[in-house]
Amino acid sequence: MKTFVAKPETVKRDWYVVDATGKTLGRLATELARRLRGKHKAEYTPHVDTGDYIIVINADKVAVTGRKETDKVYYWHTGYVGGIKQATFKEMIARRPEAVIEIAVKGMLPKGPLGRAMFRKLKVYAGAQHEHTAQQPQVLDI
């Protein structure tokens, strides 16, 4: 029996919407990364993007455990000399809540062109509204 290998042109991708209200950040991000890669499908192939499109709503209501709200620090660099910046989880949620989920999921995806293609299928919104109703996404309970 020959091993099945998925081909990029035959992969069927579904659209799902996930509500992040009250969900733990890491547990949510691992499941999102798994579904973006396509590991939940029987036809999963490591070198082919077999994952689905995922819309995350209410990103501003995601939860963390322990003291991470004040202790977890995000760092980035502006590109200028001495341009290192930092913000706590609480400040990031106030400033740009989508980035918190995006950073968590991006770190769990493969590095390289395939990982970037998978990451592009993730759509994160701070509020309850999204602009993908035409795709008729199914509700995914995580």
Curated annotation (Swiss-Prot):
Top-rank taxon, per record: Bacteria
Keywords of the record: Ribonucleoprotein, Ribosomal protein
Entry's Gene Ontology molecular function annotations: mRNA binding; structural constituent of ribosome
S-S bridge residues: none
Cellular component terms (Gene Ontology): cytosolic large ribosomal subunit
GO annotation, biological process: negative regulation of translation; translation
SUPFAM superfamilies assigned to the protein according to its UniProt record, in alphabetical order: Ribosomal protein L13
Signal sequence region: none
Keyword flag Ribosomal protein: yes
Family: Belongs to the universal ribosomal protein uL13 family.
Functional summary from the UniProt entry: This protein is one of the early assembly proteins of the 50S ribosomal subunit, although it is not seen to bind rRNA by itself. It is important during the early stages of 50S assembly.
Self-association and partners: Part of the 50S ribosomal subunit.
Stated name of the protein: Large ribosomal subunit protein uL13
Native source organism of the sequence: Actinobacillus succinogenes (strain ATCC 55618 / DSM 22257 / CCUG 43843 / 130Z)
